[in-house]
Amino acid sequence: MILSSYSSFQSVLCCCCCRCSVQKRQVRTQISLSREEELSEKHSQRQRPWFAKLMGKTQSNRGGVQPSKRKPLPPLPQEPPDERIQVKALYDFLPREPGNLALKRAEEYLILERCDPHWWKARDRFGNEGLIPSNYVTENRLANLEIYEWYHKNITRNQTERLLRQEAKEGAFIVRDSRHLGSYTISVFTRARRHTQSSIKHYQIKKNDSGQWYITERHLFPSVPELIQYHQYNAAGLISRLRYPIGLLGSCLPATSGFSYEKWEIDPSELAFVKEIGSGQFGVVHLGEWRAHIPVAIKAINEGSMSEEDFIEEAKVMMKLSHSRLVQLYGVCIQQKPLYIVTEFMENGCLLDYLRERKGQLQKALLLSMCQDICEGMAYLERSCYIHRDLAARNCLVSSACVVKISDFGMARYVLDDEYISSSGAKFPVKWCPPEVFHFNKYSSKSDVWSFGVLMWEVFTEGKMPFENKSNLQVVEAISQGFRLYRPHLAPMTIYRVMYSCWHESPKGRPTFAELLQVLTEIAETW
C-alpha cells in the first residue's frame, strides 16, 4: 500500500519573468507499507472516519488542480409549500368573534393560512378575510367526493337505510365508503310495483387495474362522479336509475373545536340556562344556550368533586380533540363557583337511558350501528394516544339522528372521591374494568378495549347492568378466575366473538379499536 502525503514543501525559484519570486511547490511523498502496517492503517481509518474521509479527498485530487479553499455557498432555503387552496363550504357558518369569516354553503373560498388543524384563515370572493372552522369546508376538486351532496363519508349501512326509508322516494340514493379500502358503495331505494313493499339495494363501486371505476365491467368510467352521472340517466344493471341524491349536507351543523380559535374560557354571562336535563358524577347538567342561538349542555361541577386546576389545563388539550363521534367540549367557565363545563348538546340524552326506554323496539342492525359509532370515536382517541378510562353506556350520548357519541373522555383522572378510585367502592366502575386496572391501576388503550366489550354487552342487552347479581368484590374474584359475561340473546355468535375478544386477560391479546372497527363494518355489511 502507498500513502500519498502533501504535508512537505520545497522552495523553488521562479525565472519566468523579471520579478523573481519564491513559490512553494507541493511535493508528494510516497511511503511504502508492509502488509501488517497496511492492515493496521486500514483499521485506524475505520476507527477515525474523519481521517479516512480526508484521505479519500486527497486521493481524488491527486494530479489535479488544488481545490479552492473557499467554502461553497449554502443551499437556498426551500420555499414553504403554498397553503392557498380553493375550498367549498359544506355548511353555513355565522361569525362568532370579530375575527371570524361567514361561510355560505356551496360558496368557494381561498385558504390563506392553516392556523391549527381546526381553524383556518380564509378569504371570500369579495376579499373579506377571517377564521373559519376547517370541518365546515372541503377542498374544491372534482375528484373530491365530499363536494357532492350524495356522498356520506362517515355513515354506517344501518344509518344509510334509515335515511333512505325516511325519504321513501323511488331511486333515492347515497354513496358511502365501502368496507373494502379504496372502494365505495351505492345504496338505492326502490318500491315494488304494488307499492306495498320497499327495498334497498347496495352496489359496490370498484376500481380496475387501469384506474377506471365501475359497478358492472361493461360500463367503465374515469371517475366516480362520472359514473354517478351516467347512472342518473341509465339504470344499466341497477334496480333503478339514480334519481334523488340524499344528503346530510347543510342539514345538521357539526360541532366546532371551541367556539372560536384558541377560545377555551367562556364568559358565564353569555350562557342562558333553559332546563335541568340530568345529573352526573360531578354535578347537575342543564340544557342551555350560548349567545342565545347555539344549544349547549352545561355541567355544574360540585366543589370538592374534582381537581379543578388540573382539569382546566387538561380541558385545553381536550378541546383540540375533534371528531364526529366525540361530544365536543366547547370550553369552561372559571370566573365563578361552581365551575361550568360547556359541551355539545345531544338531543336524545344518555345511551343507557335511551336503550332502557326503548327496550324491545330497537332492531339488531341499529344496535350494531351504535357500536360502530362508539368504536369509530374510540379509534380516533386511540390514534390520538388518548385514554378514556371510563367507557360505558352511561358516558355515551345519542343525537337526534340516532348517532352515538362518546362523552366524558379522560375526566375520571380528576375525580377526588376516594370511593370512585377504590375497587371496593360502589362508584368505581369495576364491572367495566380489566384485571390490570383493578389490580394495578394500569390504564391503556387496551383497557378501554375491555370496557368497549362490556359496553357492547350493555347495548345488546338493551341496558342491563353487567354482573347484576354480583358485588364489586365478587366481580374482581370472578374476572380473576376467568369468568366472563354471557352472550345476550340479541347478539349473534359473530357479535359475541367480538365482545369476547375484548376480554382477553392480557392487554396484548386484545384487538385494537382500528381492528374492531374493521370487523364490525364487515359484519354490518352482511346483515
Swiss-Prot record:
Residues 58-81 are annotated as: Disordered. Pfam families: PK_Tyr_Ser-Thr, SH2, SH3_1. It is found in: Cytoplasm; Nucleus; Cell membrane. GO terms for molecular function: ATP binding; non-membrane spanning protein tyrosine kinase activity. Transmembrane segments: none annotated. ATP binds at residues 277-285, 299. Expressed in early thymocytes, T-cells and mast cells. Its EC number is 2.7.10.2. The modification Phosphotyrosine is found at residues 91, 420. It catalyses: L-tyrosyl-[protein] + ATP = O-phospho-L-tyrosyl-[protein] + ADP + H(+). The active site is at residue 390. The keyword Cytoplasm applies. Activated by phosphorylation by FYN. GO terms for biological process: adaptive immune response; NK T cell differentiation; positive regulation of cytokine production; T cell receptor signaling pathway. One of its GO terms (cellular component) is cytoplasm. Keywords: Adaptive immunity, ATP-binding, Cell membrane, Cytoplasm, Immunity, Kinase, Lipoprotein, Membrane, Nucleotide-binding, Nucleus, Palmitate, Phosphoprotein, SH2 domain, SH3 domain, Transcription, Transcription regulation, Transferase, Tyrosine-protein kinase. Interacts with PARP1 and EEF1A1. Interacts with SH2D2A. Interacts with FYN. Belongs to the protein kinase superfamily. Tyr protein kinase family. TEC subfamily. This is Tyrosine-protein kinase TXK. It comes from Mus musculus (Mouse).
